A protein has these predicted regions:
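Pre-Walker A adenine-sensing motif
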Residues: 2-27
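Hydrophobic anchor at the beta1->P-loop junction of P-loop NTPases
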Residues: 33
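Conserved Walker A/P-loop ATP-binding site and its immediately adjacent core
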Residues: 37, 41-100, 139, 202
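Residues immediately C-terminal
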Residues: 61, 166-169, 199
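Conserved helicase motor
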Residues: 78-88, 106-121, 137-143
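Conserved two-lobed SF2 helicase motor
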Residues: 127-146
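SF2 helicase catalytic motif II
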Residues: 138-140, 150-185, 190-192
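Interdomain hinge/linker at the junction between the two RecA-like core domains of SF2 helicases
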Residues: 198-222
Length: 222
């Protein structure tokens, strides 16, 4: 895996202060090691000019961002999600998926609600010349992708996978949630896998989904 460094200009502490930063400097699909925790990358995603689908394994993080940004962002609330699968912190113990069987019920009403809300939100942002920001867990990314495709605007969005190191955790990587999520990302025009956690290069090389992806490191110290 070939790593490329992007030197952060001197005096910059947060991504939002970097005037020349944009996703256009990266290929459509790549790994971004921001290296410095708390550098404001997530905030840039939610305040920058791009239309962004921000994917996170942690519901609480998404809820906190929704509370901070209010109507400027749209938080996908899918009642059919299984908390044990999507709220994945690698420090938490692993649960047996058989212990949390999904509740089988008709999800058409939930889909219709999400379709209406996402359509309404994105249209209003467009009318106001504002970028759209959609917050979603790995589990519900497929729904967002499907709705935006039906609206004819999916290719107007960039997909950012925050804290993607959670996908690499041995046991969890084998779960259906992550495997399905990676399948849908493969069908997406953009996928930016972002983390500040040191990557295990040998491990990434073993995974078909990541071994051929360009790898970028933000250099804050040169």
């Amino acid at each position: 895996m070939i790593k490329k460094k992007i030197i952060v200009p001197r005096g910059i502490r947060y991504i939002g202060e970097w005037k020349d930063f944009s996703f256009n400097r990266f290929p459509g699909k790549c790994i971004i090691n921001k290296q410095l925790p708390g550098c404001g990358f997530t905030e840039y995603c939610l305040r920058g000019p791009e239309n962004v689908i921000l994917c996170s394994p942690r519901k609480m993080l998404l809820k906190n961002k929704k509370d901070q940004h209010g109507r400027d962002v749209y938080l996908v609330i899918n009642e059919l999600e299984k908390e044990a699968e999507v709220d994945k912190d690698i420090s938490k113990p692993i649960k047996n998926p058989k212990e949390d069987e999904p509740v089988k019920r008709d999800n058409s009403e939930i889909y219709e609600r999400l379709y209406y809300e996402i359509s309404d939100y994105t249209y209003k942002r467009y009318l106001n010349n504002q970028s759209a920001k959609i917050l979603v867990t790995y589990d519900s990314y497929k729904i967002v992708k499907d709705i935006l495709e039906k609206l004819g605007i999916f290719d107007k969005f960039v997909t950012v996978v925050d804290e993607f190191q959670s996908i690499l955790h041995d046991a969890r990587f084998k779960s259906n949630t992550e495997l399905n999520f990676l399948t849908y990302l493969a069908q997406s025009p953009t996928s930016y896998f972002v983390s500040a956690t040191p990557m295990m290069d040998e491990y990434l090389e073993m995974l078909d989904e990541f071994k051929d992806l360009p790898y970028y490191e933000l250099d804050w110290y040169s």
